[in-house]
Amino acid sequence: MDSLISIPFLNDESVRSTIYRKVEEFRSIGKSSKEVLFKELVFCILAANTSASMSLRMQESIGDGFLYLSRDDLRKALKENKYRFYNVRSDFIVKSRNIIDDLPALVASPDHEGSRDYLVENVYGIGYKEASHFLRNVGIFDFAILDKHIMKWMAQYYPVKKNTSRKNYLYNEEIFRNISAGFGIEPGILDLFIWYEETGTVIK
């Protein structure tokens, strides 16, 4: 690990307590029903290119509707709640319902890389960032969620590549994994500390 890298909040007991409570919350979600897991997947679909706070607001408003609303009704609900990508994301969510029954096995599988690849290949609107986000939110902390906040932070210390391909994402992720190994923290947990440093909050 580069000795110049500093994450002050790693030693802040209040922040550590907040983050590790969130970690336990994620682990609990991972043991939930397939319906709860799907709604968590929807959260990650909706957060892409918007924000976690916007996606959380959609979850609170629409709730179980993500499981059963028709495409048109879901589109209307997203639009009424001022979600920007209501057309394409409603389509993604409805088309992705066929994976609901697979989610418990994917989350329980010891092959985390395989689970992530399966999500990327089989869920509409899910790339490596979103799949990593989902797996982190259900208690799998192996992966880096390389959003704009994390990429900005990494770019202070290392030359990073744009996440425009699988190859580039995995290249950047390997850098992040090496950093996390240096701190002795799993990538998906270190991500929370950096996100807190960059934004002053932890949502999910």
From Swiss-Prot:
EC numbers, comma separated: 3.2.2.-, 4.2.99.18
Record field: catalytic activity: 2'-deoxyribonucleotide-(2'-deoxyribose 5'-phosphate)-2'-deoxyribonucleotide-DNA = a 3'-end 2'-deoxyribonucleotide-(2,3-dehydro-2,3-deoxyribose 5'-phosphate)-DNA + a 5'-end 5'-phospho-2'-deoxyribonucleoside-DNA + H(+)
Assigned keywords, A-Z: DNA damage, DNA repair, Glycosidase, Hydrolase, Lyase, Multifunctional enzyme
Residues of the active site: 129, 147
The UniProt record lists the keyword Hydrolase: yes
Keyword Lyase: yes
GO biological process: base-excision repair
GO molecular function term, any single one: class I DNA-(apurinic or apyrimidinic site) endonuclease activity
Record site feature (Important for guanine/8-oxoguanine distinction), residues: 204
CDD domains: ENDO3c (cd00056)
Cited function: Catalyzes the excision of an oxidatively damaged form of guanine (7,8-dihydro-8-oxoguanine = 8-oxoG) from DNA. Also cleaves the DNA backbone at apurinic/apyrimidinic sites (AP sites).
Record family assignment: Belongs to the type-2 OGG1 family.
Protein name: 8-oxoguanine DNA glycosylase/AP lyase
Species, as recorded: Thermoplasma acidophilum (strain ATCC 25905 / DSM 1728 / JCM 9062 / NBRC 15155 / AMRC-C165)
